[in-house]
Design a protein with these regions (language model features):
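PLD/PLD-like phosphodiesterase catalytic module centered on the HKD motif
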Residues: 1-184
Length: 184
């Protein structure tokens, strides 16, 4: 039976959530090996999106890119989508109404992720479940796979695409480092 590291599960107050997420992301950003931040969130008002927006200059300095899937988009959010983040980013809208039953998530790297509360709960009205996962490639890998599947099924928002040059630079830098021999 494989060893599973203990998870940091907590219930956090709304006022603390954005700050804790910001600390978690900044702790795990790695300029030497940039990894796109993969985010599934309820809306642009979600604490995880606000935490990422608060770190956008740090993300730029680390050479990172943000890929964001929103469950709820109104006209104003769609207009603001291109200005939500100043770092390189792409935003998509998961139009399927059943997505609201899913949990918010953030993948910071190949071994690090955060799982938030169910998106049907308004984060401004109640305290929320959170799960900080560190040093677990299995959990982060599953979160990344589910993100990619949802990304494929989601619709791009106009004005929210990352500059192609920034995305290509991160991809090229990542592929150069992943070409190193690995243990099988």
């Amino acid at each position: 039976m494989p060893f599973r590291p203990p998870l940091r599960v907590s219930v956090s107050r709304y006022e603390e959530k954005e700050q804790r997420l910001r600390q978690f992301v900044s702790q795990h950003l790695n300029a030497a090996r940039p990894h796109p931040l993969l985010v599934v969130a309820r809306s642009l008002d979600s604490p995880v999106v606000r935490a990422i927006a608060g770190l956008d200059q740090t993300i730029v300095a680390a050479g990172g890119v943000v890929r964001l899937i929103l469950a709820q988009v109104d006209d104003e959010a769609q207009c603001l989508a291109g200005a939500a983040l100043s770092c390189a980013h792409e935003i998509r809208w998961a139009r399927h109404p059943r997505l609201i039953e899913a949990h918010e998530q953030l993948v910071v790297g190949p071994n690090t992720c955060w799982i938030g509360d169910c998106m049907r709960r308004d984060p401004a009205k109640c305290d929320a479940f959170e799960n900080y996962v560190e040093d677990c490639g299995e959990a982060a890998g599953c979160a990344a796979v589910s993100f990619e599947r949802l990304w494929f099924a989601s619709a791009p928002l106009k004005g929210a695409d990352a500059p192609a040059v920034a995305v290509a630079a991160v991809a090229a830098k990542g592929s150069a480092q992943t070409s190193l021999p690995s243990r099988q």
